[in-house]
Amino acid sequence: GNCSLRGSYAGGFRAPTLKEMYMNFDMASIFMIYGNPDLKPETSHNFSLSAEYMKGRYNLTVTGFYNIVDNRITTAWSEALKGQVYTNISNIKISGAEANASAKYPCGLSARLSYAYTHENIKKGQPVISSTRPHTATVRLEYDKHWKNYAFNVALNGRFLSKVNTEEYTSNTSYEETEKVTYPAYTMWKLTLSQKVWKGVDMTLAVDNLFNYVPSRYY
């Protein structure tokens, strides 16, 4: 088999928008959102290392990453202005890993499985308001067959998202009042059937949410 190793670095830069610097907006007469002309640009440093292995019809890739974001632009409550104001927050560190495996067979059958883990490093004392789910996984099973004037394809896609523990603000006038909440894990499935009945004529039937998943709460 063939094995390869890659490393990369990328730097990011985002200047504050005119909206973030100068907008004054009435949020449904509940509170005001104010721009901040003193905002600093967001910068980021992104590191990744990946390994790939290929042998015949099989492929495996593993990637690790570490990202640092400085001066992230967000909103915070201003007691002086009695409203929210755009501001910069201290650096955020995000790390994680991804794994992808795939196989393709001569009979037309193929499969792909992927998994990702993400961790956001929150400084002690700061509320954990991220809704990023730490574990996600996807799976795809596909059968594809071609003839002279006809082609047939059926694919089953599934996506799993783990539960996430986070905090929600409980007050419109304070960024110190939060409550801990847990959003449950769930899985979604989609089935797609495609047929090429003639040159330039395709028919596709798709069923989203195959098993009729309904969340216990909306957020």
Model-derived regions: residue spans:
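Outer-membrane beta-barrel signature, preferentially recognizing the C-terminal barrel domain
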Residues: 2, 11-69, 79-104, 131-135, ...
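Repeated loop/turn-to-beta-strand initiation elements of outer-membrane beta-barrel proteins
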Residues: 2-5, 57-60, 107-111, 147-153, ...
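Short, glycine/charged-rich beta-strand-loop motifs at protein surfaces that mediate ligand recognition
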Residues: 3, 63, 174-183, 189-194, ...
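Hydrophobic alpha-helical packing residues
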Residues: 5-7, 18, 141
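Transmembrane beta-barrel domains of outer membrane proteins
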Residues: 10, 50-54, 100-104, 114, ...
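C-terminal beta-signal and adjacent terminal beta-strands/loops
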Residues: 14, 70, 160-170, 194-219
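Outer-membrane beta-barrel translocator domains and adjoining extracellular loop/strand segments
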Residues: 19-24, 31-32, 72-80, 118-128, ...
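Gram-negative outer-membrane beta-barrel transporters
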Residues: 65-69, 86-167
